[in-house]
Amino acid sequence: MALNMRVSSSKVAAKQQGRISAVPVVSSKVASSARVAPFQGAPVAAQRAALLVRAAAATEVKAAEGRTGKELGQARPIFPFTAIVGQDEMKLALILNVIDPKIGGVMIMGDRGTGKSTTIRALADLLPEMQVVANDPFNSDPTDPELMSEEVRNRVKAGEQLPVSSKKIPMVDLPLGATEDRVCGTIDIEKALTEGVKAFEPGLLAKANRGILYVDEVNLLDDHLVDVLLDSAASGWNTVEREGISISHPARFILVGSGNPEEGELRPQLLDRFGMHAQIGTVKDPRLRVQIVSQRSTFDENPAAFRKDYEAGQMALTQRIVDARKLLKQGEVNYDFRVKISQICSDLNVDGIRGDIVTNRAAKALAAFEGRTEVTPEDIYRVIPLCLRHRLRKDPLAEIDDGDRVREIFKQVFGME
């Protein structure tokens, strides 16, 4: 018995030592395509092996994480998205980003206790399942090469029949204390030198691929981490480099940030990178407040029964989003409307053309959500404050909200009263 205990202890110590040997990432950047830089001095066989990217995370750790997530999911039911009262601007921004992730994410600023986190988690629970390559740590798409990891693409080129499974859209939380190597991933240099393979432990960006990456209190996150997140969200790729070894993987996700303006604002150059910006406030109507309290109490008493009451509405909204994704490809903003959108951006002195691009995308997504392919002025009117309010130059003496200022210019350009 003592001998067995000593052997088990030495195995655990060896495993722990193997994990500690993973060198934190010093630098990371986003690349538009995957590339590999084999280390010098390695034998030919090792260099060939270096072309394979393997997840270095221990099997038992992954299994433990999977069990923990499942148990938490069962112990903490999600409040239904369709049961959320008010906050229509935030819900619209989230739905449009789900329909067209190229909008570029959404920043949600509002008071404490206004349902920001609840709404975002409810959205992830609402979305349909997706097809992934089985046992792939990057959630690779079995049919789209742009959403495949390098290893999966090599398997496809070799003619291998990929095993496919279904899973829920991943919802990844990024804690404020996360380090850069936890976000981007870690390369095990020791394993690369001794075994001739590039052992890569995926980070949060890999787990969030094809899903939602949520950062609560994003205005308190380190600026360099915000840069990494925004770069990855914009290009769809994450590249980790260390000691001449380079590993890239797809990192396409919907970036959702939330924060309280009382705790500080994001730098304008970072705020501009978010596609949309929603502002929410505390509900003032006493009747709505009573309804919110009543619904929350009912949900806390019997979550399963409460979710059952909203099941039909949830399924209908899910199908509506699926249909909108298909219809989006046929959507079109006519030339006259595009000129007027750009005129509004010019009149508001919006820097760059991100505002023009995002407004056009959001208007098409809203039209698709409403079951149409043609964008109307009403579609543009509903989305343009979300797309432009955070891109305006701040005037400390201004007496009008930025969203209202956008609406005023819209009415002037479109000739609406």
UniProtKB/Swiss-Prot annotation:
Pathway, per record: Porphyrin-containing compound metabolism; chlorophyll biosynthesis
Presence of keyword 4Fe-4S: no
Cellular location(s): Plastid, Chloroplast
Keyword Ligase among record annotations: yes
Annotated Gene Ontology cellular component terms: chloroplast
Catalysed reactions listed for this entry: protoporphyrin IX + Mg(2+) + ATP + H2O = Mg-protoporphyrin IX + ADP + phosphate + 3 H(+)
GO MF annotation, one: ATP hydrolysis activity
Disulfide topology: C345-C387
Regulation of its activity: Redox regulation; active in reducing conditions, inactive in oxidizing conditions. Thioredoxins f and m mediate the reversible reductive activation of oxidized CHLI.
CDD domains linked to this entry: AAA
A Gene Ontology biological process term: chlorophyll biosynthetic process
Transit peptide region: 1-54
Main location group: plastid
EC number(s) reported in the record: 6.6.1.1
Keywords carried by this UniProt record: ATP-binding, Chlorophyll biosynthesis, Chloroplast, Disulfide bond, Ligase, Nucleotide-binding, Photosynthesis, Plastid, Transit peptide
PANTHER family tied to this protein: MAGNESIUM-CHELATASE SUBUNIT CHLI, MAGNESIUM-CHELATASE SUBUNIT CHLI-2, CHLOROPLASTIC
Subunit description: The magnesium chelatase complex is a heterotrimer consisting of subunits CHLI, CHLD and CHLH.
Family of the protein in this entry: Belongs to the Mg-chelatase subunits D/I family.
Protein name: Magnesium-chelatase subunit ChlI, chloroplastic
Organism (species): Chlamydomonas reinhardtii
